């Protein structure tokens, strides 16, 4: 079975072809970072228009990369939510139209389920059950996963997501959009311990997160200490350490609560090397394992959508002919497989 995956939920156009026997056959990605950089964030209308321009050419490029034609595709999977409604509609409309024209099923995919299943693309794929830490620009969640579609939300951010806090703090430090990865690189030059940031909501029971206060703490620290290069690097280091420690503390609690031995980290922030090393060390001490996708599959991409679509299609969970998207869509509402 060969599935074409289409990802257009935000500011990346991702197209991929996944074969259930041969694995990933093609992966094409176009990032709109330069388009939105001057605005300091994603402009929804510009994102939608750029997806209109790029999606079909990338589909053609993916088919060429895989040395396939339309007749070789058995299904089309597309991101149906959550995300920006205009951007989602571009991918959904094109995906649905191609499926109709080619006479194959169309499968709407939950964007965060795509992220959650992305580590399954690796050779060392996790087995169920596991705790999933989903960390991106729009979501920070801890989820108990006992099977496909068997998702129990354990905790989530009550305000800013971790990735959003990274980007906002990076902007305070004078870094360009998207600043999260730049902040992490700056943090590598920082002095450990010069500044100490709080670990929000770790002094009380529960698995929810809060990161908006760290941004305010960073702003106050910058004002009080100046913004020379070394001070900025030291602040970046303190901020990143605070976020990583908070994620690790909450993940440990989730593992204790569930009794699971496996931890999956997914989403754009899961590419952060400091976070990976921290969680790997934690899981080694616990006698467990941590799983994550390669960096190119941590950020938005078509490969995770193609794979998730294939999993859903195996259970005949394709949808009707109408085009519909869900900008807000809880993972808990997905059907079990």
From Swiss-Prot:
EC number: 2.3.1.234
Domain of life: Bacteria
Binding site for Fe cation: 111, 115, 300
A molecular function GO annotation: N(6)-L-threonylcarbamoyladenine synthase activity
Main location: cytoplasm
Disulfide bonds: none
Protein name (record): tRNA N6-adenosine threonylcarbamoyltransferase
Organism: Yersinia pestis
Taxonomy of the source species: Bacteria, Pseudomonadati, Pseudomonadota, Gammaproteobacteria, Enterobacterales
């Amino acid at each position: 079975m060969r599935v074409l995956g289409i990802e257009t939920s935000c500011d990346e156009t991702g197209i991929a072809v996944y074969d259930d026997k041969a694995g990933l056959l093609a992966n094409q990605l176009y990032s709109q970072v330069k388009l939105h950089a001057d605005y300091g964030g994603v402009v929804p209308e510009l994102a939608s228009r750029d997806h209109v321009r790029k999606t079909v050419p990338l589909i053609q490029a993916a088919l060429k990369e895989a040395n396939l034609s339309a007749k070789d595709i058995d299904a089309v999977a597309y991101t149906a939510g959550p995300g920006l409604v205009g951007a989602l509609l571009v991918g959904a409309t094109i995906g649905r139209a191609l499926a109709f024209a080619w006479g194959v099923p169309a499968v709407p995919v939950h964007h965060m389920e795509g992220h959650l299943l992305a580590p399954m693309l690796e050779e060392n794929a996790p087995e169920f059950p596991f705790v999933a830490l989903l960390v991106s620009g729009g979501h920070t969640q801890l989820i108990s996963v006992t099977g496909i579609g068997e998702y129990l939300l354990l905790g989530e951010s009550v305000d800013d997501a971790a990735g959003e806090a990274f980007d906002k703090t990076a902007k305070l430090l004078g870094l360009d959009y998207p600043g999260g990865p730049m902040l992490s690189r700056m943090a590598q030059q920082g002095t450990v311990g010069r500044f100490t940031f709080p670990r929000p909501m770790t002094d009380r029971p529960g698995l929810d997160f809060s990161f908006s206060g760290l941004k305010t703490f960073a702003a106050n620290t910058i004002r009080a200490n100046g913004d020379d290069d070394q001070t900025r690097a030291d602040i970046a280091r303190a901020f990143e350490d605070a976020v990583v420690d908070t994620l690790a503390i909450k993940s440990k609690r989730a593992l204790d609560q569930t009794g699971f031995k496996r931890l999956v980290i997914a989403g754009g922030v899961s590419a952060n090397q400091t976070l990976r090393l921290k969680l790997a060390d934690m899981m080694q001490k616990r006698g467990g394992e941590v799983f994550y996708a390669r960096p190119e599959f941590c950020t938005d991409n078509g490969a995770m959508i193609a794979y998730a679509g294939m999993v859903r299609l195996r259970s005949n969970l394709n949808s009707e002919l109408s085009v519909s998207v869900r900008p807000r869509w809880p993972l808990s509402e997905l059907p079990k497989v």
